[in-house]
Amino acid sequence: MAAVGRAGSFGSSSASGAANNASAELRAGGEEDDGQNLWSCILSEVSTRSRSKLPSGKSVLLLGEDGAGKTSLIGKIQGIEEYKKGRGMEYLYLNVHDEDRDDQTRCNVRILDGDLYHKGLLKFAMEANSLKDTLIMLVVDMSRPWTAMDSLQKWASVVREHIDKLKIPPEEMKEMEQKLVRDFQEYVEPGEDFPASPQRRNTSLQEDKDDSVILPLGADTLTCNLGIPVVVVCTKCDAISVLEKEHDYRDEHFDFIQSHIRRFCLQYGAALIYTSVKENKNIDLVYKYIVQKLYGFPFNVPAVVVEKDAVFIPAGWDNDKKIGILHENFQTLKAEDSFEDSIRKPPVRKFVHEKEIVAEDDQVFLMKQQSQLAKQPPTAAGRPVDASPRVPGGSPRTPNRSVTSNVASVTPIPAGSKKIDPNMKAGATSEGVLANFFNSLLSKKTGSPGGPGGVGGSPGGGSAGGTGSNLPPSAKKSGQKPVLTDVQAELDRISRKPEMVSPTSPTSPTEGEAS
């Protein structure tokens, strides 16, 4: 019994040991399984995180005319106040940050020079293996709207020509074109209650898009499919007010311009954004649209067509009917009018800049005048004054006929008589004229018929002598010189002098006879 009991006891101990060994093996196997599961979880998480990580190698290519504001636009998006413009092709970048996964990357930005001479540099910006990761941005200067359509057509043809040179396989190119068409058709206008911060696209949104009804494309939609997204950015929209004031642009002109640009965007499946770096308008909108197209962030900003200087039309929203609404406001323009004939370049106004005249110092000016006066020869202190009295109208006063008849018989002043000194003053000149007049009366010849003898010795009898003469006053001897005007003026002044001094004074005998 005891042996049995020991044996049983032994047997019992051996059985329990076997059970313990089995459980230990199970635990070891379970730990190995847990370890494998842990590593598999870590690997799957890393692989999932790598798949959800923001991709690198995305790029934006800007094309447009010189001075359109391409570098200024990217500098404003970066938040850089001072930036330097390059030549040929500039390289910049945009920081892209995913707030949900705390991940960030850089989006390459290349800006091509506005001169077509540099279009060969596109081979460094658009390669065959990276074309699907590229977004084209066509920049239009709205301060010069008459260049808008030519600029868009020119740079779009440059891109098309370069893509054709890449010789991408037809299957791959067709897949890119179909993706662009699908994105255009699957656009859904966001509601009013959209989130403010961008988030990654989730599967539920994708499933909703798959279940949504896809509408067919219009006749003029995506007729020029490049296979990559295109954005048309109109810069310097703050110049719209300047165009209204200086060039008489009206709302219908801006609607006409917008309608033509939107038709172009329909052909290429492009979005349209009006911006202003000066007024910081829609700058953040451009950045959000870029990261939505390249990195898949949902974009929840609705279209804006009411504000003429802040228009935003995402790709897939527009169609021909919506563009036709703009035509309803046309008064002088028509929808079928040519863009070049309706939006013309205004004539260039030549501004004449007058030279600024700097006033010199008074003392310097006076010294110059003094030196000029010193170089000039000494001139007369006064000039001979015309003694003939004038009426207020400025015409000489006609002397009395009686005085004229007396003067007609007076002989001219001899050549050797005293002349007026030019250096005399005005008063001295008048006295000289009077002296010459009386000297001529004293030196007259007598005895000739019709001559001075009929006048008498005094000027007062001139009237009688004039009336007693048989010859008319106009009858003169051949060779007789005309009577001096100064003598006539002096006689007229002497005859009127009593009236000017005292209106109540009695008339002189000469005036009585003359009257």
Swiss-Prot record:
The keyword Protein biosynthesis does not apply. Phosphorylated. Residues 490-499 have a biased composition (Basic and acidic residues). One of its GO terms (cellular component) is recycling endosome membrane. GO terms for molecular function: ATP binding; dynein heavy chain binding. It is found in: Cytoplasm, Cytoskeleton; Cytoplasm; Chromosome, Centromere, Kinetochore; Cytoplasm, Cytoskeleton, Spindle pole. InterPro entries: Dynein1_light_intermed_chain, Dynein_light_int_chain, P-loop_NTPase. Keywords: ATP-binding, Centromere, Chromosome, Cytoplasm, Cytoskeleton, Dynein, Endosome, Kinetochore, Membrane, Microtubule, Motor protein, Nucleotide-binding, Phosphoprotein, Transport. Residues 397-409, 502-515 have a biased composition (Polar residues). GO terms for biological process: microtubule cytoskeleton organization; microtubule-based movement; regulation of vesicle-mediated transport. Coiled coil: none annotated. Residues 1-24 have a biased composition (Low complexity). CDD domains: Ras_like_GTPase. PANTHER family: CYTOPLASMIC DYNEIN 1 LIGHT INTERMEDIATE CHAIN 1, DYNEIN LIGHT INTERMEDIATE CHAIN. Homodimer. The cytoplasmic dynein 1 complex consists of two catalytic heavy chains (HCs) and a number of non-catalytic subunits presented by intermediate chains (ICs). Belongs to the dynein light intermediate chain family. This is Cytoplasmic dynein 1 light intermediate chain 1. It comes from Gallus gallus (Chicken). The gene is DYNC1LI1.
